[in-house]
């Protein structure tokens, strides 16, 4: 009999809480991540009022300097700590895979200056189409079709671009490059990006329609991902008959591996919370694990170095926490964490190598307090012990400390 019949893990994408011990090995625009501090700098520079996370104990997490506007609670309602990443990357896929128990010793590649000519030339030779070189860089998916869609409609060239994550995306107007052709090109791109010089997590077909000034992406997106290289705790749960529910891009991150119920993509953080709450309300969700990613912190505000927007986004999520808790059962466990940092006050536009917060809450808790500093994979080890399945590669359970 599990201690908690249902466990709900929410990843606040990129919400770091201070530079990690190995942050000197990770860089942004040539600047080491050693001074990065996503929550600390937002609190210091923009003011951060998150009363619900504060109540659980966010301000109690050990730091060299306290969060400027997030006080410590004398009687927190939950257990808190910070977690360190051991894997060699600071991207979304690496963070999530480690949270589920894997140690990634060969990180995926990200391309802040665009993909190498070797890759572009191979795609051109396979497809018989030229690639628009000016689009070959990290780009907003809507901006890239606004900027280069008209040219594609005239020339039939491919729009190949990337993001902060290890992905290659190909945007194609459905009237110019038919879907079956786009998918075939993406399948080829997948085949040449399984090893260096471009070891990528996903290839994404991004079809769109419309006229210049009024383009829109269609539902015909297709992801060509890679599955985790070893079984994660998601797989262990699914194999043992424990239901797993994914909300947001979780299913994409794991290529569907170990997911028994995909609740679908989400349009925003608030939509993600809505879907999570709908999941909590499911009458047949009697026992199991839900896994939610809220990406706006990272995609909309972190990479764009928008401190005030990031603050507002955190405060919007915090305001929904009582609603999440109201829909939890007495024997549910809520875990809130992150997958890496993305300090909106820092140099460059990339993720930052940071500790991440961990907040644990249950209506069943009799106690509260600060847990020892741990590692990302401790989350999956705790989930595994709770449901009586094996852990994955790494992780130490803190289940016995949740009382």
UniProtKB/Swiss-Prot annotation:
Subcellular locations according to the entry: Cytoplasm
Gene Ontology terms: cellular component: cytosol
Cofactor annotation comment: Binds 2 manganese ions.
Gene Ontology terms: biological process: 2-deoxyribose 1-phosphate catabolic process; 5-phosphoribose 1-diphosphate biosynthetic process; metabolic compound salvage; nucleotide metabolic process
CDD domains per the UniProt record, alphabetical: PPM
InterPro entries: Alkaline_phosphatase_core_sf, DeoB, Metalloenzyme, Phosphopentomutase_DeoB_cap_sf
Cofactor(s) needed: Mn(2+)
E.C. code: 5.4.2.7
Main location: cytoplasm
Gene Ontology molecular-function annotations: magnesium ion binding; manganese ion binding; phosphopentomutase activity
Disulfide bonding pattern of the chain: none
Binding sites annotated in the UniProt record for Mn(2+) 1: 13, 339-340
Record pathway: Carbohydrate degradation; 2-deoxy-D-ribose 1-phosphate degradation; D-glyceraldehyde 3-phosphate and acetaldehyde from 2-deoxy-alpha-D-ribose 1-phosphate: step 1/2
Binding residue positions for Mn(2+) 2: 298, 303, 351
UniProt keyword annotations, A-Z: Cytoplasm, Isomerase, Manganese, Metal-binding
Domain of life: Bacteria
Family, per entry: Belongs to the phosphopentomutase family.
The protein's role, per its UniProt record: Isomerase that catalyzes the conversion of deoxy-ribose 1-phosphate (dRib-1-P) and ribose 1-phosphate (Rib-1-P) to deoxy-ribose 5-phosphate (dRib-5-P) and ribose 5-phosphate (Rib-5-P), respectively.
Entry-linked PANTHER family: PHOSPHOPENTOMUTASE (PTHR21110:SF0)
Name of protein: Phosphopentomutase
Native species: Streptococcus suis (strain 05ZYH33)
């Amino acid at each position: 009999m599990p201690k908690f019949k249902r466990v709900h893990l929410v990843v606040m994408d990129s919400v770091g809480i201070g530079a990690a011990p190995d942050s000197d090995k990770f860089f942004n625009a040539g600047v080491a991540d050693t001074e990065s501090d996503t929550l600390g700098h937002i609190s210091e520079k923009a003011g951060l009022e998150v009363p619900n996370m504060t109540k659980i104990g966010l301000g109690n997490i050990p730091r060299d300097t306290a969060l400027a506007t997030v006080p410590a609670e004398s009687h927190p309602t939950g257990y808190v700590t910070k977690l360190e990443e051991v894997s060699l990357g600071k991207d979304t896929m690496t963070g999530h895979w480690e949270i589920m128990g894997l140690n990634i010793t060969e990180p995926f590649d990200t391309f802040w200056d665009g993909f190498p000519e070797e890759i572009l030339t191979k795609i051109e030779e396979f497809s018989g189409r030229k690639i628009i070189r000016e689009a070959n860089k990290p780009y907003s998916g809507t901006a890239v079709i606004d900027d280069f869609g008209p040219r594609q409609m005239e020339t039939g060239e491919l729009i190949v671009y990337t993001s902060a994550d290890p992905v290659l995306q190909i945007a194609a107007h459905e009237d110019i490059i038919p879907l079956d052709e786009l998918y075939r090109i993406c399948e080829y791109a997948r085949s040449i990006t399984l090893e260096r010089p471009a070891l990528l997590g996903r290839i994404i077909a991004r079809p769109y329609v419309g006229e210049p000034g009024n383009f829109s992406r269609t539902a015909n997106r297709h992801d060509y991902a890679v599955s985790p290289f070893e079984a994660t705790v998601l797989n262990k749960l699914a194999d043992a008959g424990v239901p797993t529910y994914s909300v947001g891009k979780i299913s994409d991150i794991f290529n569907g591996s170990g997911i028994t119920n995909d609740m679908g993509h989400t349009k925003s953080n608030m939509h993600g919370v809505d879907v999570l709450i709908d999941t909590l309300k499911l009458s047949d969700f009697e026992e199991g694990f839900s896994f939610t990613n809220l990406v706006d912190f990272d995609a909309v505000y972190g990479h764009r170095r928008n401190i005030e927007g990031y603050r507002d986004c955190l405060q919007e999520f915090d305001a929904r926490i009582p609603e999440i808790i109201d829909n939890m059962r007495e024997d549910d466990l809520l875990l809130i964490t992150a997958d890496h940092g993305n300090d909106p006050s820092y140099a460059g536009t990339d993720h930052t190598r940071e500790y991440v917060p961990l907040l644990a809450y249950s209506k069943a808790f009799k106690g509260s307090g600060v847990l020892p500093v741990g590692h990302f994979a401790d989350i999956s080890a705790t989930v595994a012990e709770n449901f009586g399945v094996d852990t994955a590669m790494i992780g130490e359970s803190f289940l016995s400390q949740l009382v």
